Structures are given as C-alpha cells and as structure tokens.
Amino acid sequence: QNAFPGVTNKLLAKDVDVVFAASAAAVEKLGAPEKTLVVGNPVRPEILNRDRAAARAAVHAGDRTVILSFGGSLGARRINEVVAELCAWEQANDLPVLHLHATGSRGVKLFEDLEAKNHFAPGANLVVKEYIDNMPDLLAAADLVISRSGALTLAELEAMGRASILIPSPNVAENHQYYNALELQNAGAAIVIEEKDLTGEKLVQTVSAMLAQPGKLAEMGKNARSLSVDDSLDRITAALLKLVKTP
C-alpha cells in the first residue's frame, strides 16, 4: 500500500511469486523488481464516478473555494488546533471560502473550545461535523483537502484529482506516511507539512499562498489525477488469474 514498504513486506517479497506495489517508488525498496508490478491502490467505485457539479450544489458551494479538512475518525488534536486558526483567519478576512471540517470523535469538545478561543463559529462559510459519512461527495466538491497521508486517502485524492496539504502522522511505522506524501509533493500535487513544523501560522500562510495564485489548485489537482491508477483492481485481478493458471 505504501511508498515505503515495511520489514515484513521486504522479507516476504523474496519468496513469493508476484508482488503488488502501490507506486514505482516502492519497487526498488522491496528488493524484487523482476516480480513486482505497480498496481496502485484500489478505490471505491463511487470515488471515480462522483459528479462534481452535483456535489458542489449539494453543499451550496456556489463560486467559493471549498476546503475540506479532517484527521481521521478519531480526530487528530494538532490538525484540529491549526485548522481552528485557519478557520478564524478565513472568517476574519471574509474570504470566499466554504470550509468543511471533521473533528473526529475525540475532537468535538476541543474544537468547540477552539471556536470560543479563536473567535469564529460555524455558519454559512464553515460546516463542522464529528465524522464525515459522505466522503465521496465532499471530495468531489472540494478544491483543496487538508489531511493525513495514509495510502488509501492519497489514492482517493489522486482518483478525484484534488490538490492537498498533507500532514503525515508521526505515529506510524517507519514514518511511511511522510514518504507517501512526498510522492505527491514531488509531482506538484501536494504540499507536505510535517507535524513537527506545523503551526497555525504556517498553515494559514500555505493556504493564503495557494489561494493567491489563480489556477494553482486546479494545476495541483491535475497533477494528482495524473498519479491515479484507475484500473488498479483490474491489474491485480489479471495478475492473480495469470498466476493461478500458470503450471
């Protein structure tokens, strides 16, 4: 799944008949290039088939830039903290932005406290939810996504062609989320901010710079789309069928 394969995958790669890698970056690290196929990560069909215009109409986006931010089902405290500062900046400057944010189950009370502390509130330009249960629709509506960089999240961003600011989780094996995110940044599809460098001011500056450049988000989204492997499931299925039919 990841750009940086773990120890177990590296060990198993030596003894299996075929290895499936999510990206070309993982092939060399797996140590078995002659039997490794780049197949991407399969995404849900609804991710590939969402109507963007309908999705934007459903959230009443109009001509506004739609920013979608989340830190996972439980929430990520640091993401909630810096997104709160971003929301306060957006409202203080009356920006033409619709911000959709999911706090996660552990972040509900925290975000309410941050609203009071930073003097902003949900309303016409800010929707705050505990959990996103219609992610395909919101991804389709979004212009910019702020999130962690798990492999499947990135596969969906690529499939949708969405610009992103990626904040890799520091609490994962071998820092693999950082290497996942780096692939998108190197392709001009994302900006990576490691959590050790993350502040509200830095996030505001990053978003501000992106919004100030006409066409920047669309360009990044196009770059993300170029990384998508839409036929991932077909590639995997074909390789497996070939394998079982081989004497």
Regions found by a protein language model. Give the residues of each.
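Active-site-proximal region of nucleotide-activated glycan assembly enzymes
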Residues: 1-53, 58
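Short, structured coil segments at secondary-structure junctions
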Residues: 14-16, 31-34, 95, 122, ...
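Short, well-ordered beta-strand core segments
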Residues: 19-20, 36, 145-146, 164, ...
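Short acidic/histidine- and often glycine-rich active-site loop of Leloir-type glycosyltransferases
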Residues: 29, 156-159, 175-187
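Donor-nucleotide binding loops and adjacent catalytic segments primarily
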Residues: 52-145, 178-182, 186, 193-202
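A donor-sugar binding/catalytic signature common to diverse glycosyltransferases
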Residues: 135-176
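A short, well-ordered alpha-helix in the C-terminal region of glycosyltransferases
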Residues: 216-230
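C-terminal alpha-helical cap of glycosyltransferases
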Residues: 229-247
